[in-house]
Amino acid sequence: PVNGATFDAHQEPFVTIPRPTDIDADASGRLYVSSWKNGQFNYDGPNIGFVAMITPIDFVPQPVPAVADLTALSLVELLRHPSAAMRLHVQRELLRRVAGADSNTRASVTAALRAVADDSSASQHARVVALWTLRQANAAAFGLAAASWLGDEELAEHAIRAVADLAGNADVQPALVAAVREQLSSPSPRVQAAAVIAAGRLGDREAASRLLQVASQPLEDAGADAAEPIDDWRLPHPQRVLPHLAMQAVVALDAVDACIEALPGSSSRGALWALKHLHSAEAVDGLFRTLASTRDDTLRQEIWTTLIRLSRCEGDYTADSPGWWGTRPDTTGPYYDREEWSESERIAEAVAVALGEAAEPLATHLKDQLARHVVEIGGGAAAPVAAMDELAEPIAVPA
């Protein structure tokens, strides 16, 4: 079930088969389910597994048209078929045809696809597949039509995704990028989420300030109404989705200036959240400038936390990387393999000075954050870290 920008976890058993491993559907509506019955690690043997065909009671399969024998316009109409497998098969055939077609055929297919997508009486799945087929078959024609679909409740989120389908695509006109940006204020969380992701993929830096507002939305404790106390992070948290997506979009835009300009202000939370992922001298400079100009103790503590996070970066994965994906990985975080970078020494010196001069509340906060981020200052560990005494050996699968 839909819940805001995401979905609630939901599982509804509909067929009873021992140890099912995979499922597929054909264009006539039949399901094929594979079972790993009696299987062990090696998967072999004469009586291991089976594939079952599942059909509704009294099901009468309908013959599937031979798509290779149909005209291009007939294929477009077949996009209205209720079977997703059939629609996918038809879409692929259409795209193959259009790729090698003459201009007249391309024009007629484009008009037919636009007609299906515009048809409010058609099913949503038919309209969406027509939209996406047009996006792939004729990007220019899609660009002309997309703006009108942004106001369509059924198509808006899909149109936005299609606009941003290829990150940094030069065929997306500035007016269309601006129209997508306007959807950041949509009342629909799903449309808003699509617009947030699109802003990052399209490189729309003008959206940065609005994205920071979304990333700074107040969050409630998901366990506040629970009968028994429970850690917030253990619970589904749909309201975190939009702020998280917005933060990631700001990072994708490398919007350091917008983040610094948001400090202090109502978007401070989102700005600092994004800055923790933006390892650049400009980000560190901006944080130190803000630190020197603000007297807000809470903001100062958050800036120091961000600087401590930025004092290390993620190392490149190599065969010698310590415990990245072994059976006992180091879960201390926030990085798998901490490495210093060009600003590490500068941040460390500033933290050391602050530790020597700060009043007790700030000094305690700095020590806590050094321990939390596993950062050493002045050659000594900030706090004990659980040592990985045993080598993380891979799991041995029986022969």
Feature roles, as predicted:
Residues 86-87, 124-127, 156, 192, ...:
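Residue-level detector of extended alpha-helical repeat arrays and alpha-solenoid scaffolds
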Residues 80-110:
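Conserved, compact domain cores that house catalytic/ligand-binding motifs in diverse enzymes
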Residues 1-74, 89, 93-96, 100:
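Beta-propeller domains with acidic blade repeats across secreted/periplasmic ectodomains
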